[in-house]
From Swiss-Prot:
Residues 453-464, 501-513 have a biased composition (Low complexity). This is Transducer of Cdc42-dependent actin assembly protein 2 homolog. Residues 291-302, 437-449 have a biased composition (Basic and acidic residues). It is a peripheral membrane protein. Transmembrane segments: none annotated. Residues 283-315, 436-487, 499-519 are annotated as: Disordered. PANTHER family: FCH AND DOUBLE SH3 DOMAINS PROTEIN, TRANSDUCER OF CDC42-DEPENDENT ACTIN ASSEMBLY PROTEIN 2 HOMOLOG. It comes from the Eukaryota. It comes from Caenorhabditis elegans. It is found in: Cell junction; Cell membrane; Cytoplasmic vesicle; Cytoplasm. Belongs to the FNBP1 family. Changing W585K: Abolishes binding to wve-1 and rescues the endosomal cargo sorting defect in the double toca-1 and toca-2 mutant. Residues 352-429 form the REM-1 domain. Keywords: Cell junction, Cell membrane, Coiled coil, Cytoplasm, Cytoplasmic vesicle, Endocytosis, Endosome, Membrane, SH3 domain.
Length: 610
């Protein structure tokens, strides 16, 4: 008989092949996990690198104009920009790996697992079919073996009965007939077994020659595809790294070029010139003539008699000489404070000084005033808390004692806010004029400029002054820091609109209002505050008509001061013709039947409907 164990010898190579294919797919999936973690590392590195560049870019933003002008600051800013570009390249590489490798590995892994599973199912099917055929053959062999043994026993009994003379002839014939019948049954079982053996052999041959090689070929294709995908994935990762290296190499070349632009001699010379520009020329030392030493007796007698003799001046100390040389005045002496204020004012009004020095001095003045404002606000809050504590516990103190300090703080805060606001507006104008190449001139008219100006009024009536002329004239007349700031800005901010004439529009001598500055050239930048925040000035029509009639009530009396203004009385009903554009003036028309008049009035004098 054919041993059944011969079939199961095929299972060992099949299991080994299936195990190897599974390990290949697992390894391919591990490459996908590796790519995913590599992309995460690239993304994390990009985030940290971008945060680093952003952090030091903020630290490099200095308020000092000198540091903004030196080459190493601009080079370092360019260096940080390229560093941010490198971070962007790493971010892009991570996105490419995540989109081109990780997703590809995931889809191919599912596809190969499905192909392997189908091959395993087909292999199991042909194995089961061959196993059933072998089991049927074995069952037929058992039947043939049983029939053979039965026939053999029948013939042994027949031969034994034939030798026994005591057995009748009838019993002998029965034994012979039984043996022959058993022999025929054995022959039939043998034929069935032989047929099943031939069929099983044919099926086994077909299994090993036709079916099994096909399954192995399919598993081989899966394994081959898996290995090819491994190579493709690794090549993609290398190509992404090569692209990243090329792009970062370009950024590093730009970094080297920007670093090479650092000029040590030029930066040092620029700083030196800026510092020298801030040094005031000190007054020359005067020779103190003490007189003739021979007249010492007369000077002694004069002093003894009480007559007014000449007092010997003490020689200046070393510190005072150094301060005099550097142009630094004592701030501790009360009589020298106005002079120091005038010197600071002349610092940013002197046209011969560099622009960044003038802006820096003005910025320092505004910063000092903001510190004073903050201290005043904190003092008022402290007095308010103290007064509240007195109200809560009257035994601790009298709450009315805090009223006078609160009023004083309120006046001081209001005054500081007004001065800071005026200086900030002046700073914005000065900075804008410096950026455009030369300082714009502004008019001193008392009425707003409008395209609907009344007949007979001329926009050329006001005389234009430069910023330096106004500031220099006010600097000579001011006596203190606060009065100086008021006098400086008196001509700047008492008119409804500041009139600015652009150097690019030399064809017309008519000043242009600030709110229609955008018509000079496009685009223009309107600096709205000292903080440096800018907004683009949108082009608007020269005059905005009021679509619906708006009536307002005059709160106070106002006297006409120029051709474009009008007089109003308290409680008078007015009709609004043009709204306030931010300059503090509104064009209105009275409702008088016999004396109809229109013109500009202060917006704060009007009460608008709710």
């Amino acid at each position: 008989m054919i041993p059944v164990s011969r079939f199961f010898t095929v299972q060992d190579p099949s299991n080994a092949l299936l195990s190897y294919t599974q390990k290949g797919i697992d390894f391919f999936e591990k490459l996908g996990q590796f790519s995913k973690e590599k992309a995460a590392i690239e993304e994390e590195y990009s985030t940290k690198l971008r945060s680093l560049a952003k952090k030091y870019a903020k630290k490099s933003e200095e308020d000092d104009e000198i540091l903004k002008s030196v080459s190493y600051t601009s080079s370092f800013n360019s260096f940080l920009q390229q560093l941010d570009q490198i971070a962007t390249r790493h971010q892009t590489s991570a996105e490419h790996i995540r989109g081109g490798v990780v997703s590809y590995v995931a889809s191919k892994t599912c596809q190969m697992r499905s192909s392997r599973k189908n091959a395993i199912n087909d292999l199991k099917t042909i194995n089961d079919k061959l196993e059933d055929q072998i089991n049927e053959m074995c069952k037929s062999g058992k039947c043939y073996l049983k029939s053979f043994k039965d026939a053999e026993n029948s013939y042994q009994k027949f031969y034994k009965a034939d030798k026994n003379l005591e057995i009748s002839r009838l019993e002998l014939e029965k034994a012979r007939a039984l043996a022959n019948a058993r022999n025929e049954a054995c022959e039939l079982a043998k034929q069935d077994y032989s047929a099943l053996v031939r069929k099983t052999n044919a099926e086994q041959k077909r299994y090993h020659v036709e079916l099994l090689p096909v399954i192995f070929a399919r598993l081989k294709a899966v394994d081959k595809e898996c290995i090819a995908d491994m190579r493709q994935v690794l090549q993609k990762i290398v190509s992404f790294d090569d692209s990243l290296a090329d792009s970062t190499e370009e950024c590093r070349k730009i970094m080297q070029r920007e670093v090479g632009k650092i000029d040590a001699e030029g930066d040092a010379q620029l700083v030196l010139k800026s510092v020298e520009a801030t040094i005031e020329q000190p007054a020359p030392f005067e020779i103190e003539d003490l007189g003739d030493p021979k007249n010492c007796d007369s000077r002694t007698n004069d002093s003894a008699d009480g007559s007014g003799g000449k007092l010997l001046k003490s020689s200046p100390s070393k510190n005072r000489i150094i301060r005099n040389f550097l142009g630094i005045l004592k701030e501790k002496e009360a009589d020298e404070k106005p002079e120091a204020s005038n010197n600071d004012q002349l610092m940013y009004t002197d046209k011969s000084k560099p622009a960044h020095v003038r802006l820096s001095c003005l910025r320092s003045k505004i910063r000092d005033m903001e510190k004073q404002l903050e201290q005043a606000i904190q003092g008022r809050e402290g007095i308010t808390r103290l007064q509240q504590a007195y109200y809560t516990n009257p035994q601790h103190g009298n709450p009315s004692a805090c009223t006078e300090p609160l009023i004083s703080y309120a006046k001081k805060i209001e005054k500081l806010k007004m001065d800071i606001h005026n200086l900030k507006e002046f700073y914005a104008m000065l900075e804008m004029s410096v950026e455009e190449g030369q300082e714009r001139s502004f008019g001193g008219r008392d009425t707003p400029d409008t395209t609907r100006s009344m007949s007979g009024s001329s926009t050329n009536q006001s005389s234009s002054k430069t910023i330096e002329d106004v500031l220099s004239g006010e600097a000579g007349n001011s006596s203190s820091a606060d009065d100086s700031s008021k006098n400086i800005l008196r001509q700047l901010f008492t008119t409804p609109k500041r009139l600015i004439s652009s150097p690019k529009t030399s064809k017309s001598s008519t000043p242009t209002p600030l709110r229609r500055r955008a018509e000079i050239s496009s685009p223009k930048i309107l600096r709205s505050s000292f903080s440096g925040a800018i907004r683009k000035s949108l082009s608007t029509p020269d005059s905005v008509k009021v679509e619906t009639a708006v009536t307002v009530t005059a709160l106070f009396e106002f006297a006409k001061s120029s051709a474009e203004t009008m007089s109003i009385e308290q409680g008078e009903i007015l009709l609004v013709l043009e709204h306030d554009h931010g300059d503090g003036w509104t064009r209105t028309k009275n409702c008088r039947k016999h004396n109809e008049e229109s013109g500009f009035v202060p917006t704060s004098y009007l009460q608008f409907p709710q």
